[in-house]
Amino acid sequence: MNSEKPDYNYLFKIVIIGDRKTGKTCLMNRFVENTWSEEYRQTNLLHFKVKTIYIDCKIIKLQIWDSQADENFRFNNNNLSNYRSASGFLVVYDCTNENSFSNLKHWIKDIKLYGRPNAINIVVSNKSDLVNEKVIDSDVAKSYCDSLEIPFIETSSKHSSNVEDCFVLLIKNVMKYLETEPTIPQQQQQQQQQQQQQQQQQQQQQQQQQQQQQQQQQQQQQHQQSSKTKIGCLIQ
């Protein structure tokens, strides 16, 4: 049987994470459906939307997941499977909310702990349209992201400013990684080889220690026999 070829070149799973009320759902809706609502609705169920885009003459199919945040605005176990299978993350904070910016370090740490080794992430400063309410300076945010070597972009889902650009930036970085870095199976193979080498080294060290112990025991036995022989000669 001939299996049908997919109608895309790449399939990427993108997860949007960050504190509550940072506009994660609005970003997804604006990008996928070009809609926006001022009414806040808490994300209680895991859900995703699909969008196909074209980048560098490639057809990219995206699965975009809206994540949950628990009552402490932190990692929720319901998101674990999404973290493990995500190609990239949009880490969103609200530029009018200082706590959401301070919590970036926790979200980025969660990606390292629970995400794939080659997952790509970018930081998104959302609600850039609220100029008079802004409390996080753009230069401060960019400097922080530069120190972590993470791309940074400002968006407004309300005005549709840079919304598409933030997704395209993430996808281009994912594609760049795939072109320049080893795949996950290759990484796993390298890790297995390293583990095997370490095990072999440990076995060799154990064998050497056993040989040394045997030699010491033989020397002790020889010394004891020699002492007994000398004592026997003296008695005679």
Curated annotation (Swiss-Prot):
The lineage of its organism: Eukaryota, Amoebozoa, Evosea, Eumycetozoa, Dictyostelia. It comes from Dictyostelium discoideum. This is Ras-related protein RabY. The keyword Cytoplasm does not apply. A lipid is attached at residue 233 (S-geranylgeranyl cysteine). Residues 192-236 are annotated as: Disordered. The modification Cysteine methyl ester is found at residue 233. InterPro entries: P-loop_NTPase, Rab, Small_GTP-bd, Small_GTPase. GTP binds at residues 18-25, 66-70, 126-129. One of its GO terms (molecular function) is GTPase activity.
